[in-house]
């Protein structure tokens, strides 16, 4: 992956995760408010049937923490 740092990879994954949620909410006709995005991510993270990489889990947790501050 070149010279990417772990922080850069985490940031990119956070952006991907948030973008995916916002687009899915738009498709469902919902307004993407920060608290709703955090809730969607919490629910997704709690679903143990879906395997996620450690990077994706860390990104989701970091986004949740940033949105509920």
From Swiss-Prot:
Its EC number(s): 4.2.1.2
Transmembrane parts of this sequence: none
Tree of life domain: Bacteria
Disruption phenotype: Cells grow to slightly higher density than wild-type in sublethal levels of streptomycin.
InterPro entries xref list: FumD (IPR024493)
Top-rank EC class of the record's enzyme: lyase
Protein name: Fumarase D
Gene it is expressed from: fumD
Catalytic activity, reaction form: (S)-malate = fumarate + H2O
Purpose: In vitro catalyzes the addition of water to fumarate, forming malate. Cannot catalyze the reverse reaction. Cannot use the cis-isomer maleate as substrate.
Single Gene Ontology MF annotation: fumarate hydratase activity
UniProt keyword terms in alphabetical order: Lyase
